[in-house]
A protein has these predicted regions:
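Beta-rich, blade/repeat-based domains predominating
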Residues: 46-56, 99-110, 130, 136-143, ...
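Beta-propeller fold detector
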Residues: 36-43, 90-97, 161-178, 224-229, ...
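Blade-loop segments of beta-propeller domains
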Residues: 37-112
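Short loop/turn segments immediately following beta-strands, especially the blade-tip
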Residues: 27-34, 81-88, 141, 151-162, ...
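Short glycine/acidic-enriched loop and turn motifs that connect beta-strands
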Residues: 14-18, 66-71, 121-126, 211-213, ...
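Structural preference for solvent-exposed beta-strand-turn elements
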Residues: 8-9, 14, 105-215, 309
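An edge-strand/N-cap motif at the start of beta-rich repeat modules
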Residues: 1-32
Length: 396
């Protein structure tokens, strides 16, 4: 591997029209040669929507982002894969079911040998039941998927051992609401979209876009809720990152198309909302739903991808920790916010950003201007239905 290269894993979704089966693919990216060399692949999981690299044990965790439609159908799982490839194939070491549909996020606690998953659950009605009788009257009952946060115990080698805790979230938002997701019924129940370990590993923070809450748990084999912050109705907290010191949180609000800035007390878990700004250009007036958010290693720049405006926007962070939007790069047009580009990573040295542009079936590789945070696309390569990008190794 050259000094200007990096190895990444790309999780993909299955795609009926192209017969693409989904799976995970690893590539060596050479920034000087502007090339991508396929190293290994696996067709399972078919819905590899989130990946986490365990550098200590050189293994990769992946979700299978699906929901079972019956007791005899495949349910969602978390799996671990060895990076000691055999015949250019990932090797599955272990898998375990998630107690919750559509796992969308993983967080690794190496010190405690724990893994956390946020399980979003499906959107819309799962089942419509008829209850009652002739005497009492007939009624219609609607049953929705549960959303959960699951804790998995790991072996010292990183293998999945067992589930140690399941937190089933409760509540709902305004139904129907002004969001066009599921015709205004996207908040019929909770929807955990991320579970992020705080700097130092004391807390796990869960963004619940179904109830407009950010929940703080004390980390451990059994999660203990210690705090929560309710956001304004129909804002939809989604993903978050911490500042370098851990004193500030930057959080995407999916329904209101904003980035929120919060003060975080890493000793007590207390939260304070101090700022909200739009993620899109002032001239853009259509529907937009931001997804991923990343912070540059210099702590000077934030990056957010927009689904609707179809852009990756960069923000400058001032001395008070507040972001201001400075520019954007236009991406392929999304089919709809649920079928759009939504994942990217910044290389450890802060020089490059690698983006999964799902509607275009492309991985876009950018250089980052360390003076103003702006992006310059340097090359692209084809990957069918890319959903997530994770860095496996590279220069810092």
């Amino acid at each position: 591997m050259s000094t200007e290269s990096i190895v990444i894993a790309i999780g993909t979704y299955s795609q009926e029209e192209s017969l693409h089966q989904g799976g995970i693919f690893s590539y060596e990216i050479d920034f000087d040669l502007k090339s991508a060399n396929l190293l290994a692949e696996t067709k399972i999981p078919s819905e590899a929507g989130y990946l986490v690299f365990n550098s200590k044990n050189r293994i990769l965790y992946a979700v299978d982002e699906r929901r079972a439609i019956g007791p005899n159908t495949n349910s969602s799982e978390v799996s671990v894969y060895s990076l000691k490839y055999e015949n250019n194939k990932f090797v599955n070491q272990s898998s375990i079911k998630t107690f919750g549909a559509n796992p969308t996020f993983l967080a690794l606690d190496v010190d405690r040998n724990l893994l956390f998953s946020a399980n979003h659950g499906g959107l819309g009605v799962h089942a419509q039941k008829i209850t009652g009788n002739f005497e009492s009257g007939w009624k219609t009952e609607f049953i929705f998927d549960d959303s959960s946060v699951v804790t998995y115990k790991l072996s010292p080698e990183g293998d999945l051992i067992e589930v140690s805790d399941v937190k089933v979230l409760t509540g709902n938002g305004i139904v129907p609401n002004k969001s066009p997701q599921v015709a205004g019924f996207a908040q019929t129940g909770p929807h955990a979209h991320c579970a992020v370990l705080s700097p130092g590993g004391k807390f796990v923070l869960v963004a619940d876009k179904g109830t407009d809450q950010l929940i703080v748990y004390e980390a451990g084999e059994i999660l203990k809720e210690i705090n929560s912050l309710k956001f304004p109705d129909v804002t939809g907290p989604r993903h978050l990152v911490f500042s370098e010191t851990g004193e500030l949180i930057y959080l995407t609000l999916e329904f209101s198309s904003e980035v929120a800035t919060l003060i975080f007390d890493n000793k007590t878990g207390n939260l304070q909302l101090i700022n909200r700004i739009s993620t899109v250009s002032p001239t853009f007036k259509e529907l937009n739903e931001p997804a991923e958010i990343r912070i540059h290693r210099t702590n000077k720049f934030l990056y957010v991808n927009n689904r609707g405006e179809d852009s990756i926007a960069w923000f400058h962070i001032d001395e008070d920790g507040l972001p201001t939007r400075k520019g954007d790069f236009k991406l392929a047009k999304s089919i709809h916010p649920g079928l759009a580009a939504r994942s990217f990573v910044i290389t450890p040295d802060g020089k490059h950003l690698i983006f999964a542009d799902r509607p275009a079936n492309l991985i876009r590789v950018f250089s980052i201007d360390i003076n103003d945070g702006s992006l310059l696309e340097i090359f692209v390569f084809n990957v069918l239905n890319p959903a997530y990008v994770e860095i496996l190794e590279g220069k810092e």
